[in-house]
Regions:
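Mid-to-C-terminal alpha-helical segments outside catalytic/metal-binding sites
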Residues: 132-136, 140-147, 154-191
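Single conserved hydrophobic/aromatic residue that forms the stacking wall/gate
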Residues: 1-11
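Catalytic pocket-lining loop regions of alpha/beta-barrel enzymes
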Residues: 15-147, 158
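A generic alpha-helix preference that emphasizes hydrophobic side chains
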Residues: 7-8, 26, 97, 177, ...
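Conserved Rossmann-like nucleotide-binding pocket used by diverse enzymes
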Residues: 3, 61, 184
């Protein structure tokens, strides 16, 4: 089909979520009671809020914390990026039709550099570097609208599968059993 495009085109079109064709497609998903899983970079969170506002009957799942970038021109700006990301996540979480999928921060694009280590990251290293993203999302969206996700096999370059799930247990240790059930099972089932 002449209208189909490759993955590379997605990266060239930073405003794709705002196009009429894209939003017509989202309307169809909502009509069919399907979900839209959104993955974009941190500077595009406001576009997810816009499509959530335009499509209130559509469940949108925010993937990978909306991809906070930590490489290239963003390298070394972790705290600056986190502050902007935090503000935008708080605003996005006001949309009841948006759920948060918690995981996928072990990718090289996020700049934590776990993939460069001699051995895969430990759960304690993950807690040290990423805890603030997890806790901010859980606080903003509340546990009932959050679900842990592995993002395997992509995360395999940085962390082992069982260590990742141990990390999730450490992140959630101070939450109630009901809240843990939401994040480990109920929210995903609801979606």
């Amino acid at each position: 089909c002449s209208q189909s495009r490759g993955l590379g085109d997605v990266y060239k079109r930073q405003d794709m979520y705002l196009s009429d064709v894209f939003n017509q497609s989202l309307k169809i998903l909502g009509e069919k009671d399907l979900v839209f899983e959104a993955w974009q970079y941190h500077h595009q969170i406001n576009q997810v809020a816009e499509i959530a506002d335009r499509n209130e009957d559509l469940t949108i799942i925010l993937n990978h914390f909306s991809g906070p970038i930590g490489i290239g021109p963003y390298e070394g700006k972790e705290n600056e990026i986190f502050k902007v990301w935090q503000k935008d996540i708080k605003e996005l979480s006001k949309r009841p039709n948006v759920l948060a999928k918690l995981g996928g921060l072990a990718m090289p694009v996020n700049g934590f550099k776990f993939h460069e280590q001699e051995t895969p990251a430990t759960s304690d290293q993950m807690v040290e570097k990423q805890k603030r993203y997890y806790l901010e999302c859980i606080e903003s969206f509340e546990p009932s609208r959050c679900m842990f996700e592995s993002n395997f096999p992509v995360d395999k370059q940085s962390i082992s599968y069982h260590v990742l799930w141990n990390f999730f247990k450490k992140i959630s240790e101070n939450f109630s059993e009901d809240e843990k059930n939401s994040m480990f099972y109920d929210c995903a089932k609801k979606a």
